[in-house]
Design a protein with these regions (language model features):
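Transmembrane alpha-helices
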Residues: 15, 126, 178, 184-198, ...
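N-terminal signal-anchor/first transmembrane alpha helix
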Residues: 1-38, 108, 118-124
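Short membrane-interfacial helix/loop motifs at transmembrane-helix boundaries
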Residues: 26-78, 143-147, 249-250, 299
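C-terminal transmembrane helix and the adjacent membrane-cytosol boundary/short C-terminal tail
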Residues: 2-3, 11, 189-204, 270-299
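Cytoplasmic-entry segments and transmembrane alpha-helices of multi-pass inner-membrane transporters
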Residues: 12-13, 104-139, 200-201, 214-215, ...
Length: 299
């Protein structure tokens, strides 16, 4: 009986690891394998790594795909490096905007009456019930020259001529912030709602103002939620390509769009895989910092 219980416990614990192995580790290894291969000929998108044509098998690793990312043979390859810089910049700005907007909302959500809390949570999750592309297309209609926002501002007399808002940095940031805002609010709310309010009462009894209590108690105690929300926003925002393509300008080339073009337009699977591997490595850095800060907070 005890042995079957232990084996069943191991099976349940092992399921998440098996899921991660099948859907994360194995695809990453496939991606890594393609990234060190040459371009294929004919219908094959990439060449094999092992040459079986001779008696002595040869392992053919092509690291030129990684070299081409950072060097074009003359100097630094500005196309790919600029795409990485642009992706990191807009992902960081999106994360900052989501934090600035999401923290007050999550704070209000955690402190409001329990009777209205489910309705507010439903409003946060409501966008997930509609198509991602439809939501972005709706923003195109709002931000267009003859769109809802320009017509409203003209009617109010705020502006005299339509403003150019679509296909700009601002429109792209609006779209990305709108899409990823729930990913910031939900972990912040989950963290703030569990906070012991007696700590704030004790701070007030000791003479602390509401602002001092917020910065000295609430914010430090919600650090785990802040970091979790930032990671949930930053990581997918780095590889975003749909929103920049539909709302951003031609100069806003992010790495997700570059990978798409290399894969489907140029049919250069090895180069696209190498770009993806480098992007994963860049994302692993803040992820490692997240787990390090989490361990420090728990200690």
């Amino acid at each position: 009986m005890k042995a079957s219980f232990i084996s069943g416990k191991r099976f349940v614990i092992g399921l998440p690891y098996a899921w991660l192995l099948v859907f994360f580790v194995v695809p990453f290894l496939i991606l890594l394998r393609i990234s060190v291969a040459d371009m294929g000929s004919g219908a094959e998108p990439f060449a094999p790594l092992i040459d079986y044509s001779t008696d002595a098998w040869r392992l053919m690793l092509a690291f030129k795909n990684y070299i081409a990312i950072f060097s074009d043979g003359v100097g630094v390859s500005t196309i790919y490096v600029d795409a990485y810089k642009t992706s990191l910049k807009y992902a960081a700005l999106t994360t900052l905007l989501c934090l600035v907007i999401g923290y007050p909302f999550a704070y209000f959500l955690a402190r409001c009456k329990p009777s209205i809390r489910p309705g507010l949570l439903m409003l946060v999750m409501l966008p997930f019930w509609t198509s991602f592309l439809l939501r972005i297309a709706a923003w195109k209609g709002i931000l267009a020259d003859q769109g809802v926002l320009n017509n409203l501002l003209l009617w109010l007399g705020v502006i005299k001529a339509p403003m150019v808002m679509l296909y700009t940095d601002v429109s792209m940031l609006i779209g990305m912030t709108y899409v990823y805002l729930p990913f910031m609010i939900l972990p912040l709310y989950a963290n703030l709602v569990k906070m012991d309010l007696r700590l704030l009462e004790a701070a007030h009894d000791l003479g602390a103002s509401s602002i001092d209590a917020f910065w000295l108690i609430t914010v430090p105690l919600s650090k785990a939620g802040i970091v979790a929300g930032c990671m949930l926003v930053f990581i997918p925002a780095v590889g975003e390509f749909v929103i920049p393509s539909l709302l951003g300008g031609a100069e806003n080339i992010m790495i997700g769009r570059v990978v798409w073009d290399e894969m489907f337009s140029s049919n250069n699977w090895p180069r696209a895989s190498a770009l993806s591997v480098v992007m994963i490595v860049l994302i692993l850095v803040p992820l490692a910092l997240f787990y390090r800060s989490k361990d420090t907070a728990e200690k």
